UniProtKB/Swiss-Prot annotation:
Molecular function per GO: carboxylic ester hydrolase activity; cellulose binding
Induction of the gene: Induced in the presence of lactose or sophorose.
Carbohydrate attachment residues: N447
PROSITE patterns found in the cross-reference section: CBM1_1, CBM1_2
Domain of life: Eukaryota
InterPro entries tied to this protein: AB_hydrolase_fold, CBD_sf, Cellulose-bd_dom_fun, GCE-like_dom
Pfam families in the cross-refs: CBM_1 (PF00734), GCE_fung (PF22244)
Key word Nucleotide-binding present: no
Name of this protein: 4-O-methyl-glucuronoyl methylesterase
S-S pairs: C96-C131, C277-C412, C309-C384
Amino acid sequence: MASRFFALLLLAIPIQAQSPVWGQCGGIGWSGPTTCVGGATCVSYNPYYSQCIPSTQASSSIASTTLVTSFTTTTATRTSASTPPASSTGAGGATCSALPGSITLRSNAKLNDLFTMFNGDKVTTKDKFSCRQAEMSELIQRYELGTLPGRPSTLTASFSGNTLTINCGEAGKSISFTVTITYPSSGTAPYPAIIGYGGGSLPAPAGVAMINFNNDNIAAQVNTGSRGQGKFYDLYGSSHSAGAMTAWAWGVSRVIDALELVPGARIDTTKIGVTGCSRNGKGAMVAGAFEKRIVLTLPQESGAGGSACWRISDYLKSQGANIQTASEIIGEDPWFSTTFNSYVNQVPVLPFDHHSLAALIAPRGLFVIDNNIDWLGPQSCFGCMTAAHMAWQALGVSDHMGYSQIGAHAHCAFPSNQQSQLTAFVQKFLLGQSTNTAIFQSDFSANQSQWIDWTTPTLS
């Protein structure tokens, strides 16, 4: 009798579901399983996402211990902002009409047309598109990322051992920071180089130098309370409008300035790439967008604030997806200008999205490396970059931009089956070889009609 009772008791105990390998197992807002199947360990990457990875890989996984402070935002109703008008210059020095200092924003649920100027003029030539890029850059700085300063009044550099020292001065203030260079065992100097945020997470390509850029030293990303901290803010003031990602892009530009000043560093400054993963992947995309001397941008698993579009992510969130959105991300770290806070709950009024940010890189090289982790918004990333790809198509160089989304691996763990794709882009843009970079793949499909109501012109 007793044995029968215990057998019935065991049957009555619910079996707790477990997440599969590579599945989510925790995070703020997660209501699914919090344990993993046998042979897998739940690893926390940030307070919002934990993933089941093979136990043999758990000890080497990148896990974040950053705590997120509480943050309250209110919905803003204003749809205009004022800033002094600035003249803009397109690629090749083309003179472009400046945006007015005050503009009226209009709600648009679809992704903004890459080929229509803010004043309604259609883009029909490559020169006109360069003006559109300058306009989008200004809009993104004005409403999301903050103003990017130019080269400071004074800049000097020195090189010793493998360390490049950059000294900057502005308005009586000065800062100094360093990067370290690891040279390849093959190839000939001056070497092409990849600037890696936090050192980067990609394997070092043959014949290419790797430059370790400590972006956290330029602008902190500890939590929202770290806004205004770092070398950039020591120079320009803690209340500068630039968010951390803009500050990092400024730092990357100063590294390239310094390399141009110091030929003894043995770096070919016409063959510079930039990379980073996760939060640093967001930063790498921003640097590639703003710094035209970068010929190859390699953002890895950048998610929200990187290769994902705000509009698409908001929609997917409304459909039940566990995905990071604009209204959530501003409470994680000071990556954006505080101006952005007023728009995160009214994303459709923004006169751009992140397909616009990526399109600033065209026609230069861009290879977007993504994962299929829910929190990164893989559907949003693929849809967003599909829209961005139209910029390269319009310019007649569609193979200068590639996209690869492969899952079943830990966050920022570069899988071997993307190696040949990465090599092709590096060889084409950094080593001057002829390779096939017509790469655009994902397990998802992009519903272009839902987000795109404009066509791709052939620019003359």
